[in-house]
């Protein structure tokens, strides 16, 4: 009995300690809330006889300290016409759907919706932009502006779900507070509407569903949003307006899409959160997505408006992403925001008190301990990943705590099969290396490149590796034939050429057999196994000595080495079946290596009279990441925590020659065009080896 009493006493002590801590934080927020203190205290007094709601109110107020954003000062005259039209569209769509009693996605329902939508747009497309919206924005901390009425309405609404829904009642207190109760889903994101608005808009579409099936709920949400935005033209305004943005195409990126999706699902009783990946392995940018908590306690990832969560997350592509962070409403004490030493620089991506690393729910992660022997007072070091979309060329993706006694740093959440740059930051935000960049293989083994002191002359041909998917398409073009005939129906025809090898991602020639020529009609015919003309550029080459009038200058073949400069054939010209200006709309003649007539099996070239075509100069569909003559390039070398420029040059040919220390990690930038870039080494055979193949 004594032992049990001690346990109970200790538990009550913990509870009182937690309560005391929350009360202290509430008092702190009240002390800095100025004129709005009365509103916040009104909320606490309102719930003094409802202990559960009082605890919820304290949780929200205690965590307001760092929540800050633009918010909308609403008034009835803000956008009355838009309010009227969106309500009308919502009502028309809702009644169209529920006039039928069979499947929500039945084709007959879709026909009815389309009919109603067409009529609505005829009447209102022009009206939408007749009246400009007048949004009055202010920027402030939440504790300075959220009113008692807004907070009480929100808390009452959320607790009504707790009363009605078993799934909400089953949630732990922590999950309820973090994933249903919050009035915002992304910190610092503009706040225009609260849960009562979102509920009134969406819940009527969900009443016939079992909300334990989060997949069905998300599928219905996606259907509703994708249908309603067809009732309006492209977004005509220059600023945010609130949830009515969902009625339009053309304004959203993934951030508001995720924010609205999660906020609306929460307002309808579905535990949800917004997450983002720090960056990608090879590409610029990052992505925000949603997650929902299913009845089995599993977090399922999805993209609001465009994808449905699956029970094993197999539909969510994770192969190219770095660490995943979830936005919480409460302060997360194990983040750099709180762990930094006074004056220590925290990278922008981690300068938030609301981040939680949740990478392991979608990807394998491992702990990693690295040596750290740098001087200074930093508490934190970082593993960064390459990203060409930021000036520094790197983005920190995870943090580690420095142990100066053991001279190491421990990272708790590191993804294998990724390339990392170990860095720390000065108080002014300058990055420095505390180790050489390395690849962490799938087994968690660190692999480093050996950098030698000698200087080598190397030839660079690309700024980004050839994409395997495009290589696969080029391989499938093997067996494609070039046929020629003097009959427009190609009956009969001669096979005058064939693609016998894998085409490289630049111009190359296929020689044609003209022993029976000349011919009036030519066609490139793909195989039955792969009936797709994935050829980005085509030129039909003839000899200038034939004296044909329907010719223009041919594009040069690539010059990939100094020896190629001697091989130019000045007798080659391009034969035309129509003036270039008339055919530039065609993918194979538009000058863009990234487009092709891939949907079609055949490309035809129809002359006015028989003429000799000696070669076809062709290029397979490709990402255009080779060196382009005439483009301006910069070459950087990784050195002690930063990319240092070692070359700036306008490419004369399709290669660049430079002297570099053997084994150096390099980054080649095209300043003229294109975004895809990736660091590389040059191996002992002079070949570029990108950090990801």
Regions picked out by a protein language model, each given a short descriptive name:
Residues 406-421, 425-428, 516-518, 659-662:
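Short Pro-Gly-centered beta-turn/loop motif in secreted/extracellular proteins
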Residues 16-17:
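C-terminal motif of bacterial Sec signal peptides marking the signal peptidase cleavage site
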Residues 427-453, 540, 680-688:
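Structured interaction patches on ligand/partner-binding surfaces of diverse proteins
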Residues 453-508, 514-517, 530-615, 619-628, ...:
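Disordered, acidic Ser/Thr/Pro-rich linker "stalks" and the adjacent N-terminal cap
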Residues 25-34, 42-52, 111-114, 204-224, ...:
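Hydrophobic/aromatic-rich core segments of domains that either
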Residues 364-375:
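A short, amphipathic beta-strand motif
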Residues 31, 39-42, 49-249, 285:
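Secondary-structure boundary elements
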Residues 425-435, 528-534, 672-678:
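Short acidic/polar inter-strand loop motif in beta-rich domains
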